[in-house]
Amino acid sequence: MIITTGNEVAGYEIVEYLGIVRGIVVRATGIRRGLVGGLKSIAGGNIEEFTHVCETARIEASNRMLAHAKQIGANAIIGMRYDSTEFSQGSTEVLAYGTAVRLSK
């Protein structure tokens, strides 16, 4: 499966557009990570506890998007993007989305 943020894939022709595919995940930091991350935020800089939650959510959302694309018979996803929104205090929604296509050489 080819996944790109671009709208075309060099060396391939798009033979069919299958529609939008997406994967969505809502993740909470959890009490321990939330407390440690909250304390670290006072000092500033990168907060590894929150970074871990965000990266895990992106991977999970990507995997769900990929499964959706395979389910509808795509062999590529173009225009792939991530979006995230704070869902509630301590919870974040991560959305991975793109256009599922069939490519041919």
Identify the residue ranges that each predicted region occupies:
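N-terminal presequence-like segments and the immediate start of the first folded domain
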Residues: 1-33, 71, 75, 92-105
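Short, solvent-exposed loop/turn elements at beta->coil junctions and helix N-caps
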Residues: 6-9, 82-86
